[in-house]
């Protein structure tokens, strides 16, 4: 009887240990996709960011390149139209010169009129709005890629929280401009620590001030990683420029993906891991006999 009680007690202890172990397994389950309410240890690596971004770019190359090309055409159209209207509305005065050798030449002086000044001002506003729209659109698509959601070309033209993005962008430009007037360095520092503000506005619908605060906290949590990520993004864009600007169709999407990866990792969020090729099926072939 005592032996039976002993085995029953031993079985009870084993069941309790297994139940506790199962509980530990549940506790160790990874959190659902998204992001926590506070920053965690990110385990960020710029090498992983570059590898992940390139992997995701190769899987969505056309979907990423076409929107960048379309935005580039739109930017060129706004710049060209503004410049053409400014020149057309300005006053031009032609002066002829003849040197001592009898060679004649002309110079054209262009004086901007009030109408031309208004057109230039409106052109700057349109260009600024288009850049923010492009930034928000590309971030929206890249964030969906980071979440593992299917994306299309149209995804990059449907930015989320556009109103918050516009106000956040205006806030960043205003503070950076004021910092630049006081001294160049404060403006540059603020621009650097506020680099994730638009991503917060797009991804988490935070207010402009909260987006800037969250970006400063995120950069402060890993300054070294933020600097390396920024340098990697800059390198991707510069390499694209060196390739006769055609490479920017690749460099800009890769830089945007690095930016999103860094933002998610440093802010305690998650990204869908890169898909690696599966190993070959079956045993490898053995040595061939002659």
Q: Where is each model-derived feature located?
A:
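Hydrophobic aliphatic residue packing
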Residues: 13, 25-26, 73, 146, ...
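Alpha-helix initiation/capping motif
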Residues: 6, 11, 15, 39-42, ...
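Short, small/hydrophobic-residue-rich motifs at membrane-helix boundaries and re-entrant hairpins
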Residues: 34-143, 169
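Alpha-helical transmembrane segments and their immediate juxtamembrane interface regions
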Residues: 101-110, 200-228, 257-284
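Selective recognition of hydrophobic, aromatic-rich stretches within alpha-helical transmembrane segments
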Residues: 34-37, 113-149, 173-210, 237, ...
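Single conserved hydrophobic/aromatic residue that forms the stacking wall/gate
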Residues: 1-26
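Intrinsically disordered, low-complexity Pro/Gly-rich regions
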Residues: 19-20, 24-42, 272-290
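Interfacial aromatic "cap" segments that immediately flank transmembrane helices
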Residues: 43, 47-74, 150-179, 193-241
């Amino acid at each position: 009887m005592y032996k039976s009680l002993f085995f029953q007690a031993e079985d009870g202890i084993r069941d309790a240990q297994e139940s506790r172990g199962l509980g530990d397994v549940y506790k160790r389950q990874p959190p659902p996709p998204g992001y926590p309410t506070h920053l965690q240890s990110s385990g960020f690596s710029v090498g992983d960011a570059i590898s992940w971004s390139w992997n995701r770019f190769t899987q969505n190359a056309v979907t990423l390149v076409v929107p960048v090309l379309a935005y580039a055409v739109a930017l060129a159209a706004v710049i060209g139209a503004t410049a053409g209207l400014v020149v057309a509305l300005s006053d031009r005065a032609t002066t002829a010169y003849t040197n001592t050798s009898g060679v004649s030449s002309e110079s054209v002086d262009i004086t901007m009129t009030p109408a031309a000044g208004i057109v230039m001002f409106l052109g700057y506003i349109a260009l600024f709005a288009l850049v923010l729209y492009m930034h928000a659109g590309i971030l929206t698509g890249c964030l969906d890629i980071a979440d593992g959601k299917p994306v299309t070309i149209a995804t990059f033209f449907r930015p989320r929280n556009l109103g918050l993005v516009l106000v956040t962008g205006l806030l960043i430009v205003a503070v950076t401009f004021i910092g630049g007037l006081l001294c160049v360095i404060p403006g540059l520092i603020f621009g650097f620590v506020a680099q994730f503000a638009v991503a917060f506005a797009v991804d988490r619908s935070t207010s402009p001030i909260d987006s800037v605060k969250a970006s400063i906290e995120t950069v402060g949590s890993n300054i070294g990683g933020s600097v390396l990520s920024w340098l990697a993004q800059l390198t991707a864009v510069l390499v694209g420029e060196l390739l006769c600007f055609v490479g920017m169709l690749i460099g800009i999407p890769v830089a945007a993906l690095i930016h999103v990866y860094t933002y998610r990792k440093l802010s305690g969020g998650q990204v869908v891991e890169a898909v690696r090729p599966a190993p070959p099926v079956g045993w490898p072939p053995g040595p061939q006999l002659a």
